[in-house]
Amino acid sequence: EVACLIERINKARETPIWNFIGFFDDGIPSTNDYPQGPVLGDINVLNTWKTSLSITVAIGSPKTLKSIVDNIANKKIDYPNLVDPSAVLYEIPQIGIGNIITANCVFTTNIKLGSYNIFNIGTIIPHDVIIGDFNVFNPYVNVSGNTFIGNRNLFGVKCTIIQGKTIGDNNNIGAGSVVLNSIDSCKSLLGNPAINSILILKEYFRIVKKEKQAK
């Protein structure tokens, strides 16, 4: 998908800005190719690349995303921000590096972004939102205004964050969840309203046990 994003960025300009040369992948042999281009090698090949190179790390797991970036030691590597031509960006006074903003995302005003965040299709980031590093927003996440989001959080498809909340670090918010309260760190939440997924499982097993006893 990010290779297609790069192609869209190039097509939107009179002069293409990027020369896409291929992929680096630890899990795919360099003898294999993707439809969009060749696999050039693994992270060891990347770390010994001899010339300047711009890369983007496109991984949907915050933990893995950070691990890969931490293991890239080549000083010739840089991390541009990639923004789809259809994305709407009103005002982002502060932005880091390596962010991926895909089609139909909307960013309004007075937003501060860290680095290496991935914003999938249709994500909405409104006024006065602060976002840290290595967060992954799946399609159609809706963040309300004046929200603080820390680092390494995973937001499921179509989840919603109500205004003025704080989301800590290393949280996993399930698809379709509605977050009505601030979240500390290292939580897995699910549902509307979003609650600890462990509590949901406990309630499920309680109901199942009760039904079995009734029989």
Question: What name fits each language-model region?
Answer:
Residues 121, 133, 138-215:
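Glycine-rich hexapeptide-repeat left-handed beta-helix
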Residues 61-115, 119-129, 141-143, 147, ...:
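Left-handed beta-helix
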Residues 28-88:
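Phosphate-bearing ligand-interacting subdomains
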Residues 3-8, 67-71, 113, 184-185, ...:
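Short amphipathic alpha-helical segments
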Residues 1-32, 47-49:
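Hydrophobic, well-ordered beta-alpha structural blocks that scaffold small-molecule cofactor pockets
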Residues 18-20, 52, 76, 96, ...:
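A general structural motif
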